[in-house]
Each structure stands twice: as structure tokens, then as C-alpha cells.
């Protein structure tokens, strides 16, 4: 193991002050969710947020889906090397999918990194940091399989009103462009009772909205032999008192069945929103991607959803420039996008990911061709997004106010949140009106539309119609009591046989106890975007 003695001097003792941390997140909602668990684990071990100041510990939670993820990581690590030289006792940790994939390469390229951990052992981070600090030596720990389910780790949620709930981890699909199954393993499903208990715990903690997470949520139940388990789970979650909004991501078109559409339509708490990855509109390219569906099936799913859930906002993922993609293939993608009328799309230029079947395919598309096609696709989708948003102008929508969505709210006297269909809404607070708290719900009339958001300006200066919620109450309590930290749960006894723990999470528990709690063995912590 490489030494980091030349990069790390002894850190200040924790009796002087708690050490501070910052978690930087790249990638999907799974990673956002994982970062909440990393944050919770650090706070359970006595670390405190740097709150924008220069941190003693910087944790980078990485993504491996695109080539620029590597460039972004090593660019950030290069910058942090200079910071670390002047910041006594600073530590740097790299985790997530890219760490799982590259392993020792991270330390070879950036020997000033203190800890490298993977997707299967997030709960070990506090222990690895303490070990690296004590030994003056970098710690590399990558596990090949999941030991503790992520949802059982302590958590610190960014949004009190909303929470992520993992229903499964891993993926059984074999898409030729995707590295995720190799890094996160085969699908493992949680039991429905554990999921519902976690949702109830989140609601008890103030949440009014949850997003169910999985690499392929509608294959949920495959491990325990119930192919309609996901639809049943939606209905059961919808029966939890106090839970107002349910979302989920991401389904797979090949396994998306009508019982799920029925559950969406018949469960009031399930929001009129669907993220359905297309990837390509060309049947030939879909076959090369091993996507197991074709464009007409995909469009048929959207038609059935819109029949049962009118005005559903449907979003998607699209890859441009997959190996072998011709202009004719790309035109098929444009055709399907025009027909699908997505409210928005996450669009990507294909990049080679070593370790995937697509990386060795012939007919890699030249970068300049990919870039030109990408520009045409994004222009088309931006026009469609604007047109779809304009259809909402004049309607009254309920907005769940967010604490973090708006970036200019202080300058514009607006607050920001999400409508029930997931659209971002900036709403004006008229002079003299009460201001909604994060977590409160506000009924507003949409007055303007842009491609990526809606605006609700006051037309008559009347006070906002605010519905105060339990989530707003919880936010207010959190503002008054900012010393709460997650409490770690206990794991199996030493020497027990390895297994995957599928238990429940530990949520925020306000306490007046010292935040310099001893660091325990990471394997003893039960565990909880992507």
C-alpha cells in the first residue's frame, strides 16, 4: 500500500474541535442517495459539515458511466493536492463506481489520496479514514459483493420534505454500453416490509415525498418470485398516512407492465411523472445495445401511460453516437423523440467505457459526427420541452417548496419547488405575503414557461395560498435545533457469517451529546441517487 506520509501531516486532535467534511457527488440519483448515507455515516462518527468552508476531509463519490467522469475526478484531485499541502491534517477519500472500477489506479495517479472505497462498503468510510490517519498510509478497500444493504446506514437528508428509498441494488440486464452491473453486481431486492417500514420512518421524520430507487425498479420482486411486486409496492406505499408524493426511477421498457400503469393511475400519491429511458430510437441500435425492446413497444408504453395518467410528464435518457449509428439510425431517434413528446431528456454523447462490450465494437462514430448529432437532438428536445411547458401556462399547480432547488431566489424574491409532475417551478412571493417554508405546499397559477422550468408570477398581488405541512414543521424544528446527528445502528456480532443485511435505516436523532463519538468498525453499521 502506498504511503501518504509525504502528503499528510498529523491531524489536529478531535478533542480540539470536531473534524469537518465535504462530500462531492458526481453521477446519478443513486449516487446522490449514496452520498446522503456517506454524510450520515460521517456525522454518526463525530464529523461535522464544513458548511462551505475548507474541509478537513473531502469525499468524492464518483460515477463511471461516462469518460469525462475520469477527467473530472483527476482534475479535482489535482486541485486538491495543492490544497492538502497547505491544509494540515487534510484527508481525501474517493468512492463510488469509478473507485470500484479503477481500484489501485486511483492511488497510482493520485498518491495523495488517503482512502479508496467501493460501492459495496460505504459504511466502512469512517473506519478507513481513521486507519489512514493513524497509520499514515493510504487505505484501499474494495469488496466484490454487497455485505450490508445501503438503506441501513445512517442518513442525513438534504431535503427534509423528501427522501430516497432503495428498493433494490444491482442490475441483471446486460446493456452493452453500461458498466454499472459490473460495479454494483446482480440485482438484490429488499423485502417489501423493510421498504414500507423505511418509508414510514421517513414520514415520521417529516418527509411527505419519497422516490423509490433501483437500477430497474419494475424488475423488483425477481428474487422472491413475484413479477407484480413493484405495482403492489406502489399501492402499499400509497396507503401510508402522511405520504403525499411517490416517485420512482428508473424502470426498463422491456419489463414495464400494465399492472404498474394501473397502480400509477389508481394510487393518488403516485405522481403523474415517469422517467422511461429510450437510449435510441433505432431498432437496429437498440438490438446492438441489448435493450430487449423496440421503438414501437416503447411508444406504446407511453400511449398507455398517458391514457391512464393524463398529462403525465415523461422524461428519458438518450445516447447519441453509439458504435455503428448511421445518419438513418439517428433520424429514427429524432422521429421517436418527436413522437414521444418528452417533457425533458438527459442526453449523452457516447463515450467508450473500458470493460463494456460496446468498447470493442467496430464502427466507432467519429467525435465530430457525434457532437453534430448531439446538437441537433438537444435543439429538438429543447423545442419540445418548451412547447410542453407552454401547455401548462394558465393552469394551477401545487408546488412542494424546496430548500435547495433555487439558485437566485434571494435576488428575485422567488421560492422554488417541484410541481406534482416533477416540473421545476419558480414562484413569486408577493409583497406582504407570508413566505412558504421548505416542505410547505403552495397552489400557484403558471404564468410563463421556459424550456427547463415554469414561472408563477403574482398577477394580482394576492397572498400566496400556502398549505403548511408536517415537512415544513420539521424544517422549522431543524433550523431551531441544528445539532442533531444520525445514530449508528448495530450490526452482527463479530465472527458471524457474512450476509447481506436488509434491515432498516437510522434517521436523524436530535441529541445534545458530544459529536466526537468514537469511530466504530465500518462493517458494524447497517446500511442505506442512483
Swiss-Prot record:
Q: Which cofactor does it need?
A: [4Fe-4S] cluster
Q: Which reaction does it catalyse?
A: N(6)-dimethylallyladenosine(37) in tRNA + (sulfur carrier)-SH + AH2 + 2 S-adenosyl-L-methionine = 2-methylsulfanyl-N(6)-dimethylallyladenosine(37) in tRNA + (sulfur carrier)-H + 5'-deoxyadenosine + L-methionine + A + S-adenosyl-L-homocysteine + 2 H(+)
Subunit composition and interactions = Monomer.
SUPFAM superfamilies membership: Radical SAM enzymes
Q: What does this protein do?
A: Catalyzes the methylthiolation of N6-(dimethylallyl)adenosine (i(6)A), leading to the formation of 2-methylthio-N6-(dimethylallyl)adenosine (ms(2)i(6)A) at position 37 in tRNAs that read codons beginning with uridine.
Q: Where does [4Fe-4S] cluster 1 bind?
A: 28, 63, 97
Protein name in the entry: tRNA-2-methylthio-N(6)-dimethylallyladenosine synthase
Which keywords fit this entry according to its UniProt record? 4Fe-4S, Cytoplasm, Iron, Iron-sulfur, Metal-binding, S-adenosyl-L-methionine, Transferase, tRNA processing
Amino acid at each position: 500500500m502506498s504511503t501518504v506520509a509525504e502528503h499528510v501531516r498529523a491531524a489536529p486532535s478531535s478533542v480540539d474541535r470536531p473534524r469537518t467534511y465535504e462530500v462531492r457527488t458526481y453521477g446519478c440519483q443513486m449516487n446522490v442517495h449514496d452520498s446522503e448515507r456517506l454524510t450520515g455515516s460521517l456525522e454518526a462518527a463525530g464529523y461535522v459539515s464544513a458548511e462551505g468552508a475548507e474541509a478537513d476531509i473531502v469525499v468524492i463519490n464518483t460515477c463511471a458511466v461516462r469518460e469525462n467522469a475520469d477527467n473530472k475526478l483527476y482534475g479535482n484531485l489535482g486541485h486538491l493536492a495543492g490544497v492538502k499541502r497547505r491544509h494540515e491534517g487534510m484527508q481525501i477519500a474517493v468512492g463510488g463506481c469509478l473507485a470500484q472500477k479503477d481500484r489501485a489506479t486511483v492511488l497510482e495517479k493520485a498518491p495523495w489520496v488517503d482512502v479508496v472505497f467501493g460501492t459495496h462498503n460505504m459504511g466502512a468510510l469512517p473506519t478507513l479514514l481513521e486507519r489512514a490517519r493513524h497509520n499514515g498510509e493510504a487505505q484501499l478497500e474494495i469488496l466484490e459483493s454487497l455485505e450490508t444493504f445501503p438503506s441501513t446506514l445512517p442518513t442525513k437528508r438534504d431535503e427534509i420534505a423528501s427522501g430516497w428509498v432503495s428498493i433494490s441494488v444491482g442490475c441483471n440486464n446486460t446493456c452493452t454500453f453500461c458498466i454499472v452491473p459490473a460495479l454494483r453486481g446482480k440485482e438484490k431486492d429488499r423485502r417489501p416490509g423493510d421498504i414500507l417500514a423505511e418509508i414510514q420512518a421517513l414520514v415520521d421524520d417529516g418527509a411527505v415525498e419519497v422516490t423509490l430507487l433501483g437500477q430497474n425498479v419494475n424488475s423488483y420482486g425477481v428474487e422472491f418470485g413475484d413479477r407484480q411486486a413493484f405495482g403492489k409496492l406502489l399501492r402499499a406505499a400509497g396507503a401510508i398516512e402522511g405520504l403525499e408524493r411517490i416517485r420512482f426511477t428508473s424502470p426498463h421498457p422491456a419489463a414495464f407492465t400494465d399492472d404498474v400503469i394501473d397502480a400509477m393511475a389508481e394510487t393518488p400519491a403516485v405522481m403523474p411523472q415517469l422517467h422511461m429511458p429510450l437510449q435510441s430510437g433505432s431498432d437496429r441500435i437498440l438490438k446492438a445495445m441489448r435493450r430487449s425492446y423496440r421503438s414501437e413497444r416503447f411508444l406504446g408504453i407511453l400511449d398507455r401511460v398517458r391514457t391512464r395518467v393524463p398529462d403525465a410528464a415523461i422524461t428519458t435518457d438518450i445516447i447519441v453516437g453509439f458504435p455503428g449509428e448511421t445518419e438513418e439510425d439517428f433520424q429514427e431517434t429524432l422521429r421517436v423523440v418527436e413522437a414521444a413528446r418528452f417533457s425533458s431528456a438527459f442526453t449523452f454523447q457516447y463515450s467508450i467505457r473500458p470493460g463494456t462490450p460496446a468498447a470493442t465494437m467496430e464502427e466507432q462514430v467519429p467525435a465530430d459526427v457525434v457532437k453534430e448529432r448531439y446538437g441537433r437532438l438537444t435543439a429538438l428536445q429543447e423545442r419540445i420541452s418548451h412547447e410542453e411547458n407552454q401547455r401548462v401556462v394558465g393552469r394551477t399547480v401545487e408546488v412542494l417548496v424546496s430548500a435547495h432547488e433555487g439558485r437566485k431566489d434571494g435576488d428575485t424574491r422567488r421560492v422554488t419547488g417541484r410541481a406534482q409532475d416533477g416540473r421545476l417551478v419558480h414562484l413569486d412571493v408577493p409583497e406582504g405575503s407570508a413566505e412558504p417554508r421548505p416542505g410547505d405546499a403552495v397552489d400557484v397559477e403558471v404564468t410563463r414557461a421556459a424550456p427547463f422550468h415554469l414561472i408563477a408570477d403574482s398577477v394580482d398581488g394576492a397572498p400566496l395560498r400556502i398549505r403548511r405541512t408536517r415537512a415544513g414543521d420539521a424544517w422549522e424544528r431543524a433550523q431551531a435545533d441544528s445539532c442533531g446527528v444520525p445514530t449508528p445502528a448495530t450490526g452482527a456480532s463479530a465472527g458471524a457469517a457474512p450476509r447481506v443485511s436488509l434491515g432498516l435505516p437510522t434517521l436523524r436523532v436530535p441529541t445534545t451529546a458530544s459529536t466526537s463519538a468514537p469511530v466504530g468498525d465500518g462493517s458494524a453499521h447497517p446500511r442505506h441517487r442512483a
